Curated annotation (Swiss-Prot):
Entry's EC annotation: 3.1.26.3
GO cellular component, as recorded: cytoplasm
Active site positions, chain numbering: 65, 137
Pfam families from the UniProt entry: dsrm, Ribonucleas_3_3
Chain residues that bind Mg(2+): 61, 134, 137
Protein name in UniProt: Ribonuclease 3
Primary gene name: rnc
Catalyses which reaction(s): Endonucleolytic cleavage to 5'-phosphomonoester
SMART domains linked to this entry: DSRM, RIBOc
GO biological process: mRNA processing; regulation of gene expression; rRNA processing; tRNA processing
Subcellular location: Cytoplasm
Every DRBM domain range: 174-243
Amino acid sequence: MPYRKHREKKYEAKYREAFKVFQEEIGITFTDEKLLIQAFTHSSYVNEHRKKPHEDNERLEFLGDAVLELTVSQYLFQKYPTMSEGELTKLRAAIVCEPSLVRFANEMSFGSLVLLGKGEEMTGGRERPALLADVFEAFIGALYLDQGLETVWGYLKEVVYPKINEGAFSHVMDYKSQLQELIQRDGSGNVEYQILQEKGPAHNREFVSRVTLNNEALGLGSGKSKKEAEQQAAAEALKKLKEQS
């Protein structure tokens, strides 16, 4: 057997074993293992192995992107029933953006499984953020095709959703949403807003709002609209709670 073919067979056996271990670690066994391998196959690897029936992960990445958007949207819709469309969109964008996907991929050691061409390997492709984000999306796409939406949901429940619950994306929320999330996380009770005062002429109104937690005042705020006053009250409440913790 020529040396090159022998080396390729050894490499193939090595990565198949790696994918077997990976499936054991995540507790999911693919019905079609080719889909799993394709999710981790970069175009540079396919270009160097043209005689073999390899497919790269770009189409799976396209599908995974849509599946991620849907599942994360559904989770946020259910978790934050009072959050506005604009805030939900902003929060979802923070969760599915490249740096977040890279973080998820790194925590699962996806980089070590990627099949790369030699040139891409030599230029540090395995650590390249865009590549890792693409692989995470492709994996979600492959998981969806092989196991369906329920398994994808279960996987994200282990890998992504806990980080939302821990407040990893709170910085992109408005003050009211941040406060609501903090209270939900701590299981402290119910937050309520009251408009205490409206003053000034119609063209220049000022509103004063109070936010309470279990009927205890947490913060006061004022603004040119009820919404602005409530946001300022929530900001004061957040500051107070952070000082106490």
